[in-house]
Every structure is written in structure tokens, then in C-alpha cells.
Swiss-Prot record:
This is UPF0276 protein BPP1075. InterPro entries: MbnB/TglH/ChrH (IPR007801), Xyl_isomerase-like_sf (IPR036237). NCBIfam families: PRK05409.1 (NF003818). It holds the Pfam family MbnB_TglH_ChrH. Belongs to the UPF0276 family. It comes from the Bacteria.
Length: 289
């Protein structure tokens, strides 16, 4: 097993966190759970006021907050959307979140927005482009961001840089951190037939500032082959739990978010899963001691 990575100064506490859903707000107010942080999607709060901000203000008074962007299209050819950049900056000034993150993906082209996180070609031109976009975002905020590794379903013949190496280069050139989505690693490993543990060993693990866990769906392609989809609509798969424990053996305890964006159950069911996250983190802390 590779040596454990040394940890950077943390932004989020090395505890279990949960993605905030407005339908859980009343339950949260009635009985605030013992969690380290909540995560929100930035684009849902780029309005001046209303119930969403009242709820977020309540959370911010009680928990660490992670702001997770889904629409900047850091991997795209288009210039970054100035309105989204301004919205991120306003959120940062208003709430001083403990972490701000985005995806290694694209979602805009020729001024049109696509409601998905689409894969990029891993070549030198893309590396320069993504670095420039990360630099622009970080300069806007005045702080480093975390960049999330993607779940992918296709690979491009034009790619000549390994994804893990691409992420290493981005971290080295821009000073950004890594949001390590363990479910995405597993999904991509199954879809493309690579070794998930070997992939993890090639990542810049000392730069990991947050981990994501989520459920996935299993489908079949036109040829009948199994394809995993990063659906966020089911409990975390046992294989992903195993990979998460392996990851913690490499990184030590890291703030870990449970994501659930579809088929959302009552809060109690999600808190049971975050309890398992907390147990994994406690074991990781004991090993690190």
C-alpha cells in the first residue's frame, strides 16, 4: 500500500457531512443533527433573498458550509460566465464558506448551456484551458478551490494524458485542491475497466480537501454491457464503501459528504448513512494516531 499522504491545513472539519435538501429543513430545525458540515449547490442560491437564503443562514450559524458549483464549465472552450463568477463571489462574501468546489467537466458551448457534466479530452490544449479557467475562478474568489474528479462513460482517442496525471498537473500548476469523489472513481473504473486502487495511488492525495460518496445506477448499453451511472439516487454501494475505507487508509480522515439528489428519503435514512461515514472516519483517525 502506498504511504499515507500528509494532510494540508483543512478547510472543512474531517467529519461526516450531508448535502442540504430544503425538504429536510423543518426536521433539521426541530432536531439539529450532529454533523460536521452541509453542502449546497451554488447555483440554487444566486438570488438576492427568499426562503433559500433564510435556510442557508440558519445552517451557516450552526455548521461548516461547503459551496459546490455545477455550472461554471471549467473544462469548456467558452469563456467563463461572468454572471456565475459574480454569483460565486457574492455567496463567498455573504457566507464565508469553508470550502468552494467545482467539477472537471464542461456544460457550455457557443453560449448554450447543457444541463449535464460532460467529459473533456485529456490533451495539452485542454490542460492549458482548464488551468486558465481555474486560475480565473480562484483569482475571482481570492482563494483556492477544490476540483472534483469526474464520472465518465466515454473516452476519447485524442486523449493522450492519463486522467490521474491530468489532475496532478492541474493541482501543481494552479494550486487548487482535489475533491475526491470515490463513487466517481468506482463508476469510471467499472465503465472503462481500470484498477480503481491503482488510479487512487496516482492522484495528488495530499491535496484532497473533501471526499464525496454517493449511490449509482446500473444500466446496459446498446451491446448489453453493464454501464454504471453516477445517479445520486440510491444508497452508497458496498463496493464504494470498501473503496472509501481504502482511500482513508491513504489519506487519513478527510471531510466526507454523503450526496443524495434523487429518490430522496427521510432525513433519518440519510443520517444512518452519515453514521457509517463517521464510523469509517473514526477508524481512520485511530489508524493515524
Amino acid at each position: 500500500m502506498p504511504a499515507r499522504a500528509s494532510r494540508p491545513a483543512p478547510g472543512l472539519p474531517a467529519r461526516a457531512g450531508l448535502g442540504f435538501k430544503p425538504e429536510h429543513y423543518a426536521t433539521l430545525v426541530e432536531q439539529p443533527p450532529d454533523l460536521g458540515f452541509f453542502e449546497i449547490h451554488a447555483e440554487n442560491y444566486m438570488v438576492p433573498g427568499g426562503p433559500a437564503h433564510a435556510q442557508l443562514a440558519w445552517l451557516r450559524e450552526r455548521y461548516a458550509i461547503s459551496v459546490h458549483g455545477v455550472g461554471l464549465s471549467l473544462g469548456g472552450h467558452d469563456p467563463l460566465d461572468a454572471r456565475l463568477l459574480a454569483g460565486h463571489r457574492q455567496l463567498q462574501r455573504r457566507y464565508a464558506p469553508d470550502s468552494i468546489s467545482e467539477h472537471l467537466a464542461w456544460s457550455r458551448h457557443d453560449g448554450r448551456y447543457f444541463n449535464d457534466l460532460l467529459p473533456i479530452v485529456y490533451d495539452d490544449a485542454a490542460l492549458r484551458r482548464v488551468c486558465a479557467h481555474i486560475d480565473q475562478f480562484q483569482q475571482c474568489l481570492g482563494q483556492p478551490i477544490l476540483l472534483e474528479n469526474p464520472a465518465t462513460y466515454v473516452r476519447f482517442e485524442a486523449s493522450h494524458i492519463d486522467e490521474a496525471q491530468f489532475l496532478c498537473e492541474l493541482v501543481a500548476r494552479t494550486g487548487c485542491g482535489l475533491l475526491l469523489d470515490v463513487n466517481n472513481v468506482y463508476v469510471s473504473a467499472v465503465n472503462h475497466g481500470f484498477d480503481a486502487r491503482a488510479y487512487l495511488a496516482r492522484l495528488p492525495l495530499a491535496a484532497v480537501g473533501e471526499i464525496h460518496l454517493a449511490g449509482h445506477a446500473r444500466q446496459r448499453d446498446a451491446h448489453g454491457r453493464a454501464v454504471l451511472i453516477d445517479s445520486h439516487d440510491a444508497p452508497v454501494d458496498e463496493a464504494v464503501w470498501d473503496l472509501y475505507e481504502y482511500t482513508l487508509a491513504l489519506t487519513g480522515p478527510v471531510a466526507t459528504l454523503l450526496e443524495r439528489d434523487g429518490n430522496i428519503p427521510p432525513l433519518a435514512a440519510l443520517l444512518a448513512e452519515t453514521g457509517r461515514v463517521a464510523a469509517c472516519l473514526a477508524r481512520g483517525l485511530a489508524l493515524a494516531a
